[in-house]
Amino acid sequence: SDGDLSIDVRSEYNMAISQNCAKRDRGSTTGTDLSKEAMDAFLLGRHIIEQSTARGSMSDDEYAVVQAQADIAANAVEKCIAATAIHYVNDVEDDYDLIVDGEYASKSNFTNLTKHWAELKGFALGLQFNPTSPYAADDMRDELKQILTDMGDAPVLADGSQNGVAATGTAAEAIAAYRAKLVAARDAMGVAYGFDASDVENW
C-alpha cells in the first residue's frame, strides 16, 4: 500500500488464487515460491507486450518469449491449485482424526469436514483444464481421473456412508479405506507437480 488510506484493487489487493499461492509459499519448509514464479513470468511477458505495442510490432523472438512466459505463469498458477488441493487433503485428514466410534467430536467437526472436502474436490477438478498441465500428458490423464474418482462425489461420513450409500463394513473400515485413497491422491499430486514430500505432508 502507498499509505493513502485507501486500497487500489488494481495494485494493492491480492485476489483469489494469488492468496492461495501465498498461503502455500508461507506453509512451505523448503523455500517453495510459487508467487514469485507466477509473478516474474507475468511481469516479463507484460513488459515485452508493452514495448512491442509502443513500437507497433512484435518480433518472432519476442512472441516466443511471451508464449513461454504465459506457459510458465499458467503452470505456476496450476501448481498453486494443486498445492491447495493437497492442503485440503491434509485438513480432511485432521478432521477424520477427531471422529471416534462413528461419532463426530462436535458439530464443527462435521461442518469442517464437509467444507474442507468441498474445497479439496473443487480445487482438484480445476486440474483438468490447462493444456500444458502434467495431467494433460497422455500417460497422466488416467491418473487424474482415478484421483477424482477416489475422492468421490462426497466425503465418507462418520457413520461410514458416502453420498447416501451405507458402508458395506464398519464405519471405521470405510473411513480408513477412504483416507488411504485421499493420501494416495495427495502423494500422487505431489509427485506430478514436483513438490517436496515434506511440503506435501505439511501444507
What are these regions (language model features)?
Residues 1-203:
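Mature extracytoplasmic or organellar-lumen-exposed domains after removal of signal/transit peptides
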